[in-house]
Each structure stands twice: as structure tokens, then as C-alpha cells.
Amino acid sequence: MTDLPDPLPVAAGIVSFHPDAALLLDLVATLSRDVGRIYLFNNAPLEPALEAVLADYPALVAITADSNLGVGVGLNFIALAASRDGFERLALFDQDSRPWPGMLPRLGLAFDRLEALRRAPAALAPRLVAPRGRVAGASKPPRYRPRRGCPPDGALTPVDFLPTSGTLFNLRTLRETGMFRADFFIDAIDLEWCFRAWARGQSCWLASDVPMEHTVGTGTIPLGFGLTMPNQRPFRMGTYLRNTLYGFRLAHVPLGWKLKQLLYLPLQCFGFARHHRFRAAAVGPMLRGLRDGLAGRLGVPPDGPPS
């Protein structure tokens, strides 16, 4: 087996909100071996004991917001800080991501290859898989949509969009494409950015031979027709619906995707409401999300989690 080279000038960023201490510490410990700096943006204060342990990592820079500003603000703050500090690439993670040692250098080699082939890569992601030992159906890994008319290169596949977690970004391209939409707060931020990158002549890639364990939601909801969806908290379902509907007015979001969502969203709404027994606490955020998406009202959701 060939030895991996020293890491390229790469930083890592994590956006957290009341994280599981053990998972976050494992993530920081793994990343500290492969990157020059770790930026941790906290949307809520950390427990003092966790802060004390994190202080032992000299490469970690922690920033805590006064209130929950959302994932988009955290991602942008991290990207700007890494750019200011001279890093060329940035890998972004959720607080419960589970990369393995050496994963980022391996993605870096693949990124180098795509750049050498002049494929204009903006982002490259590992393939997210359910954590080992999880009961079947406890988490739904994302489905990746291969980009039509764009040939793969071995295990590297061009895809329409990527989840943020584990994804390696070219910071120059990120700045040129534009930062993440902070007004989305959470949900569909990565999807909108990837569609924007494609519209500007850049590309997004999946390294299908590089798995990374990651949990999406708190179980799955059957929708019929062989379809399932992740079970999320009601406010998350509301922001997902809001941001998806708002995306219909964006020219860089493909028409085919919009038409597919027109068919899929009603199925998701009914399946989510039925799963939660049509309780007002579940249906209310969905209705507000639909209303706000149609009206173009974005920002911090009124029923979002407090700090």
C-alpha cells in the first residue's frame, strides 16, 4: 500500500449545537492528525468540561455565538476564517460526523487528480453511510444523483449536489461562487450551493470508494412506493419545506429538480404528518414553512430551537 503524502494546506470546520461530547471529541481527535487547523463554530455554549478538554488541542480555534445563528452563518464564518489564515482547501463537518484517520489526505489526492484533469472541482465528498451497528432503518444515507452528461473518472462521480458533512471545498472557488446562504438557517444550504456552483461552470464530485459514517435524522419514515425519508424534528421539516419552496424561484436550480420536488413534497408532508399522528406540534411548523417559502420569508425560523 502506498504511503499517503503530508496533508495539503487544508483546514477543517465544524458547526455545533449542543453536541454529544464523546462524538465531538472523537471528531476533533481524528481531524487534528490530518489538518493544519480546526475551526469549531458553536451555536450554543459548550459544557465547561468539554471546553476544558478541547483547550488541549492547539490547532483548534473555537468561536461561540451569543445566540443560535444557524448552520449557514457558522459555515461562512469558518470559510472566511480559513481564507484569512491562508488555507487553500476546507473540509466541513457536522458535529456527529465520523471521518477516519487519513480520509482527508485521500480526498486531497482525488481533488488533485480532478484539478489536473481540468474538471473544475468545487467540492469533493466521501460517500456517507449509516454507522456500523445501527439497526436497519435507524438512519437513511443520502442518495446521490449523478450529473447528466458529465462522465465519471473511476470511483469519482460528478453529482448534482453533496451533503456538507465531510465535503472538501476549494476555498477560492467557494468565494467566487458565493458563500452559503445564511438566510436558509439550516437545511438545503448545501443543495442550493452545489446547484449554484454547477451553474457557474464548476463541478461537485463524490468519491464513492471513500465511505464516512454519518447519522441523518432520528430514524426513517416510510412513504410508500419503496420510498423513505429521514425523521427530523418538526422545526427542521418546516425549514426544509420553506427553503425547498424558495428554491423554486432561483434560476440556477434546475427545472427537472423543481418538477421532481413538486411530486415528492406532498408525499413527504403527508408521510411526516401521519408518522407524528397529525399532531399540531408537527403539522404547525410544516404549514408555517410552506407559507414562508411561498412568501419568500427566510431567516431564523420562529419555532427554531433556542440557544
What are these regions (language model features)?
Residues 14-33:
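Short, well-formed alpha-helical segments that are part of the catalytic scaffolds
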Residues 42-50, 67, 97-98:
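A conserved acidic beta->alpha catalytic loop
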Residues 65-82:
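Glycine-rich, basic loop-to-helix element that forms the pyrophosphate-binding segment
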Residues 87-98:
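Short beta-strand-to-loop acidic/aromatic patch adjacent to the donor-nucleotide binding site
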Residues 101-137:
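Conserved donor NDP-sugar-binding/catalytic core segment of glycosyltransferases
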Residues 140-160:
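Short, flexible, basic/aromatic active-site loop/helix in glycosyltransferases
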Residues 167, 173-178, 183-210:
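A short, conserved alpha-helix in the catalytic core of glycosyltransferases
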Residues 249-307:
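Non-catalytic, C-terminal membrane-associated alpha-helical segments of glycosyltransferases
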